[in-house]
């Protein structure tokens, strides 16, 4: 699948916040020193109408999870077909992605690194190899690192970095055995308040 391979800081600057696209070895300000928007006229912040605000919010969430537009729209369509709040369903689907779960458990320092671990067959789901980053983890599923991958330096470093992040209530992790359990899909109350998924629903429902 195609992926964005350009500068990560450029995306964070565009959205005006840290999208967690780089490891947490250094803080966001030292990694992305410029706070201006990318481009020739980055020092001039444009005025956004309602559509522009909705679009920026969609781009922020899409880039946070490292998903291209077509796949993101498909997640929205699936969320809209499910019972309950479309916004909450959408975020639950994104959080259930295997690459995201691997990142949340601390086995990778970024979602991009988690995606690579999954693609390289370093991750097990219920003791079976799964190499599809978009695989949807179900409540009660266990996710672990394969035995031969446990000594990888990047996984050890990621686990150390993960101690600086706030724990996720919907995930339990045993770092000693490189294993975790996805207890339940999170609600909007569990997730960051840095984005408003309802704006995405408004954008796509037009």
Curated annotation (Swiss-Prot):
GO terms for biological process: ribosomal small subunit biogenesis; translation. GO terms for cellular component: small ribosomal subunit. The keyword Acyltransferase does not apply. One of its GO terms (molecular function) is rRNA binding. SUPFAM superfamilies: Alpha-L RNA-binding motif (SSF55174). Coiled coil: none annotated. The keyword Transmembrane does not apply. Part of the 30S ribosomal subunit. Contacts protein S5. The interaction surface between S4 and S5 is involved in control of translational fidelity. One of the primary rRNA binding proteins, it binds directly to 16S rRNA where it nucleates assembly of the body of the 30S subunit. This is Small ribosomal subunit protein uS4. It comes from Legionella pneumophila subsp. pneumophila (strain Philadelphia 1 / ATCC 33152 / DSM 7513).
């Amino acid at each position: 699948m195609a992926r964005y391979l350009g500068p990560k800081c450029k995306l964070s600057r565009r959205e005006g916040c840290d999208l967690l696209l780089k490891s947490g070895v250094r803080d966001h300000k030292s990694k992305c020193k410029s706070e201006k928007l990318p481009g020739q006229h980055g020092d001039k912040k444009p005025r956004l109408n309602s559509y522009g605000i909705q679009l920026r919010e969609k781009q922020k969430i899409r880039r946070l999870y490292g998903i291209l537009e077509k796949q993101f729209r498909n997640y929205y369509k699936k969320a809209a077909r499910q019972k309950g709040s479309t916004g909450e369903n959408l975020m639950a689907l994104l959080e259930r992605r295997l690459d995201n779960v691997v990142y949340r458990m601390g086995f990778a320092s970024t979602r991009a690194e988690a995606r690579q671990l999954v693609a390289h067959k370093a991750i097990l789901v219920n003791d079976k190899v799964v190499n599809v980053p978009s695989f949807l983890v179900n409540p009660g599923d266990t996710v672990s690192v394969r035995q031969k991958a446990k000594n990888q330096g990047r996984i050890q470093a990621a686990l150390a970095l993960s101690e600086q992040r706030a724990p996720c209530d919907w995930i339990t992790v045993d770092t000693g055995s490189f294993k975790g359990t996805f207890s339940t899909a999170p609600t909007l109350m569990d997730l960051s308040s840095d984005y408003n998924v309802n704006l995405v629903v408004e954008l796509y429902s037009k």
